[in-house]
């Protein structure tokens, strides 16, 4: 997929669509654990936005935008997915019981968080890493 493309309209539209899909994916990720959305759907949207950039430009351009190796991203996601239930277990709760806490912010009110956000973040990283590893391996063989 290392070819010169002169599709100016496609490239311009892809950049705009990239940001729109990323914002929508982030909002679905934050919608999270108990409502439609979460790590899997957000990860699919994040990966699809990177696929749009890959189609409009090439793999090297996409790697400049996201320089982290996607196989490492799969490992990071698995660490979050495994560490979240183990952390609640060490805090004296049952395995996979979510712990709630507040993050104090200086000017704003504290943000209420649960460990489900970290688990969903791990799922997001694993999904993005898996989808992009598959897409890149298919694209590099052509």
Swiss-Prot record:
Q: Report any one BP term from Gene Ontology.
A: sodium ion transport
Q: Which InterPro entries match?
A: CPA3_antiporter_subunitB (IPR050622), CPA3_sub_B (IPR005281), MnhB (IPR007182)
Indicate how activity is controlled. Answer: Na(+) extrusion is completely inhibited by the H(+) conductor carbonyl cyanide m-chlorophenylhydrazone (CCCP).
Q: Name one GO molecular function term.
A: monoatomic cation transmembrane transporter activity
Source organism superkingdom? Bacteria
Claim: Cell membrane is one of the keywords in the record = yes
Q: Name one GO cellular component term.
A: plasma membrane
> Which cellular compartments is it found in?
Cell membrane
Transmembrane residues, as ranges? 9-31, 35-57, 70-92, 116-138
How does the UniProt record describe the way this protein sits in the membrane?
Multi-pass membrane protein
Assigned keywords, A-Z: Antiport, Cell membrane, Hydrogen ion transport, Ion transport, Membrane, Sodium, Sodium transport, Transmembrane, Transmembrane helix, Transport
Description of how the protein assembles with itself and partners: May form a heterooligomeric complex that consists of seven subunits: mnhA1, mnhB1, mnhC1, mnhD1, mnhE1, mnhF1 and mnhG1.
Q: What does this protein do?
A: Mnh complex is a Na(+)Li(+)/H(+) antiporter involved in Na(+) and/or Li(+) excretion. Na(+)/H(+) antiport consumes a transmembrane electrical potential, and is thus inferred to be electrogenic. Does not transport K(+), Ca(2+) or Mg(2+).
Which family would the database say this protein is a member of?
Belongs to the CPA3 antiporters (TC 2.A.63) subunit B family.
Q: What is this protein identified as?
A: Na(+)/H(+) antiporter subunit B1
């Amino acid at each position: 997929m290392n070819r010169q493309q002169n599709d100016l309209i496609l490239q311009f539209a892809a950049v705009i669509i990239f940001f729109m899909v990323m914002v929508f994916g982030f909002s679905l990720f934050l919608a999270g654990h108990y409502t439609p959305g979460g790590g899997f759907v957000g990860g699919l949207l994040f990966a699809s936005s990177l696929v749009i950039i890959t189609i409009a430009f090439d793999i090297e351009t996409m790697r400049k935008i996201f320089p982290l190796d996607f196989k490492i991203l799969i490992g990071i996601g698995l660490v979050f997915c495994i560490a979240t239930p183990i952390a609640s277990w060490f805090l004296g709760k049952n395995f996979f019981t979510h712990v709630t806490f507040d993050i104090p912010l200086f000017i704003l009110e504290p943000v209420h968080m649960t460990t489900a956000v970290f688990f969903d973040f791990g799922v997001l990283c694993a999904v993005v890493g898996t989808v992009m590893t598959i897409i890149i391996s298919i694209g590099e063989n052509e």
